[in-house]
C-alpha cells in the first residue's frame, strides 16, 4: 500500500488553467460519444508517434510513454469507433457530479491505492438514479490525449473505461483535473443517468 501523500496545492492561475482543461475534456467526451467515426480520425493521426518499441512519443509531451500493446491497441480502438461504436447523446455538466469527481481525485492525490467508498460519496451532493460510471486517467496533461488513452485502454483487454464513456444510459457528467505527486496529473470523470443536486452541491460547486 502506498503511503498517503499531501494534497497538491494550486494557485489561481493553475486553477483557471485546470478549469479550462475540464471544460475541454467534457467537449472531447461529447465529440467521442456523438460522432465516434470522426473521433477515430484523431486516433489515426496520433498513431504515428509510436516507435518500434511500443513507446509513444507525442511532440507536445515532456517524455515518451511505454505502452503494453503499442500501436495495435490504437488500431483496435480505430476499428471499434469506425465499425462498432453506436453514437449516443452528449453529456450535460452536473455540479454535484463535479464535486464527486473532485472528492475522488482528492482521495487519489493522497493515496494512489485508495479504496474509494463510492457508496458513501455518491449521496453526498445529490440523489442518484440509474446507471453510474467513474473513470480515472493518470499522467496525461492534454485533454485530447486523456480521452484517447481512455478509449484505447492500453493493457486492459476488457476496454472497460471505453465502455464507460459510451454508456448510453448516462445523461450527466462531472470532470475533475488536478496534480498528482507520482503521476504528475490525474483526471476523474463521473457520469450518471440521473442526478438531482442537493443544496450543498449548488452552494459548494
Label every PLM stretch briefly.
Residues 16, 196-204:
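Low-complexity, Pro/Thr/Ser/Gly/Ala-rich linker/spacer regions in secreted
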Residues 4-5, 72-73, 136-137:
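Short, flexible segments with low predicted structural confidence
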Residues 10-111:
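A short alpha-helix/helix-coil micro-patch that ends at or immediately precedes a cysteine
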Residues 1-12, 204:
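Acidic, proline-/serine-/threonine-rich low-complexity intrinsically disordered repeat tracts
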Residues 5, 16, 61, 68, ...:
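Short, well-ordered helical secondary-structure segments
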Residues 94-198:
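A well-ordered secondary-structure block
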